[in-house]
Amino acid sequence: VAVDAALKAGEEILSIYTDPASDFEIERKADHSPLTIADRKAHVTIATILNETPFPVLSEEGKHLEYDTRRNWDVMWIVDPLDGTKEFIKRNGEFTVNIALVKAGVPIIGVIYLPVKKELYFAGQEIGAYKLSGITTLEDDATLDKLVAASVRLPQDLQRDRFVVVASRSHLTPETEAYIDAVKQEHKHVELISSGSSIKICLVAEGKADVYPCFAPTMEWDTAAGHAIARAAGMEIYQADKK
């Protein structure tokens, strides 16, 4: 159901993204970050599908419930309908649809879809992490087993001769730059990749990057889906100020 929701939201986003007449109807949220009609439409698409399940939905573009209200939810969906709105507005294709199922504070299912690249990352606590390329819709007879069979297991065994750091294209903070400088002192050959949205976490889970440092403020919907994928690929997300 999460994959179906992500793909349908991606289709909705692309219909706006590829429309040459679209000005994206950009608004500003309370924190001054951009919001477009695509964010709103993707949210409605996902919420309509996920609301058919027994679990509540926490979405970046939905009604923001106080933490005291939702902290006792044992199982819930955490959604970012359009992660990387700045990248969407720039039309560089580096935006994603993020959906996670979280149980007792632990992300156990994660789905991240890249509409422009038609790439789907998905993971489950019991099945591992996978990447499927060239997908836009689910077949009528689609099953999880068929999805897994058509996908590549993560991480891939990629041979690299350098330490790869992937960092934010839109939020490269002084703290991140200092971290990268420290990595360069530790490793002889360091390559820096810049990317937008949750693609960065996917690149680490995939084995194309070694680390993604982030020192900018983040919310649950920024990391939940990527965290599930990283965990299922045998990796982890840590707080920067803790060992």
Region roles according to the model:
Residues V1-A6, G10-E11, L147, E177-E186, ...:
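Oxyanion/phosphate-interacting regions
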Residues A100-I201:
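Acidic beta-strand-loop-alpha-helix segment within the catalytic core
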Residues P56, I109, D210-V211:
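Short, Asp-centered acidic motifs that coordinate Mg2+ and/or phosphate
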Residues V1-L82, L158, A178-D181, Q185, ...:
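N-terminal subdomain of lithium-sensitive/metallo-dependent phosphomonoesterases centered on the IMPase/IPPase/PAP
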Residues R40, G62, S170-H171, S198, ...:
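Short, surface-exposed acidic/glycine-rich loop or hinge patches that mediate macromolecular interfaces
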Residues I13, D39, L50, T85, ...:
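Residue-level signal for inorganic ion chemistry
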Residues W73-I112:
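Glycine-rich active-site/cofactor-binding loop and its immediate structural neighborhood
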